[in-house]
Design a protein with these regions (language model features):
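Sec/Tat signal peptide C-region and signal peptidase I cleavage site
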Residues: 23-25
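Bacterial N-terminal signal peptides that target proteins for export
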Residues: 2-12
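Bacterial N-terminal signal peptides
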Residues: 11-21
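Extracellular/periplasmic head regions of type IV pilus-like filament subunits
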Residues: 29-48, 55, 59-129, 134, ...
Length: 156
């Protein structure tokens, strides 16, 4: 066999191998995502993404309580809250939290009445990516049909 013929032969075998691998990969059944394993007793999360979103919310809520004890009022933004408790400056830099987007709203109605709301909105709402809502009372509400609000059921 000539050298040119050998190169064509191996190129043909390689092409068939690549095509075969491509076809078998395309026909392979999709692997179901592993079932969520609770991180602690009574974990209300339904997925790893929810666990991360709820963890972020708990950190913000604890930091707000600490901030209020130190300054006699709540932080007016996530940037102002940064460095309080375990809420880091890096956590305050972006509202993109993986599969979720965080939103923070502060409102002062009078010198002795202030409110804040924290929401975690999933990029794709479904039963394992619920939306979450919390206010200054610290209760976290969840909904898998629409954006969570004060009227949504509380998570455990």
């Amino acid at each position: 066999m000539s050298r040119k013929r050998i190169h064509r032969y191996f190129a043909g075998i390689l092409a068939l191998g690549v095509l075969g691998a491509g076809f078998s990969w395309a026909q392979a059944p999709a692997q179901p995502s592993p079932e969520y394993k609770p991180q602690f007793a009574d974990d209300p999360a339904r997925s790893d993404s929810e666990a991360q979103a709820l963890g972020y919310m708990r950190v913000v809520l604890r930091a707000q309580n600490t901030y209020k004890k130190r300054h006699s009022h709540y932080a007016e933004s996530l940037h102002a809250l940064a460095g309080t408790g375990s809420f880091t400056k890096r956590m305050a830099q972006t509202t993109d939290r993986g599969d979720y987007t965080a939103s923070f709203l502060y409102r002062r109605e009078s010198p002795d009445r202030e409110q804040f709301a924290l929401t975690m909105t999933p990029k794709h709402l479904d039963s394992s990516h619920r939306s979450f809502f919390a206010e200054e009372d610290g209760a976290i509400h969840a909904d898998d049909q629409k954006p969570a609000s004060l009227d949504s059921p509380k998570v455990r």
